[in-house]
Amino acid sequence: MSDKNVLIQVKDLKKAFGTNQVLDGITTDICQGEVVAVIGPSGSGKSTFLRSLNLLEVPTGGQILFEGTDITDPKVDINRHRQKIGMVFQQFNLFPHKTVKQNIMLAPVELKLMTKEEASKKADELLARVGLPDKANAYPDMLSGGQKQRIAIARSLAMNPDVMLFDEPTSALDPEMVGEVLELMKELAQSGMTM
């Protein structure tokens, strides 16, 4: 691990909800290209930990350094850092009134990171990468659970993140759909994505 760049450094991370101490002093380094799994029983703080890494949950103590910047510092523009952190949730969170391609293009265009033309090209590339090029004009309700999750992954990849966080990405899927999502995650890991 020492020969790789540390991408995320967590120091004594704490998170409490009222008197319930969910995270109590987590310290870890996550290096570029590394794949890390957080394993534990239901209610043990796994989702809280992941959500803390991009400040969707604000820690009550400790530090999180992302690419060397302390993102827990209130002076830091967290939205700039969130653009580099892809997040895939248990639920797909796709916009039902937008096509698959529009869902993928939305953030890069709205944040002015790409023109519509660039985002369209990127969306086509990502749809091919996740094995769904024929679904560009489909709406989310026309897709299976596995297809929706692959689109959610493509949407996160559209921002060209440095790291991808997955919060139980297969738990809401039928058993036969799990394999296609795990295969995509395996391909991402093999390509060097930090996860």
Task: List where the protein language model places each region.
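ABC family nucleotide-binding domain
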Residues: 5-195
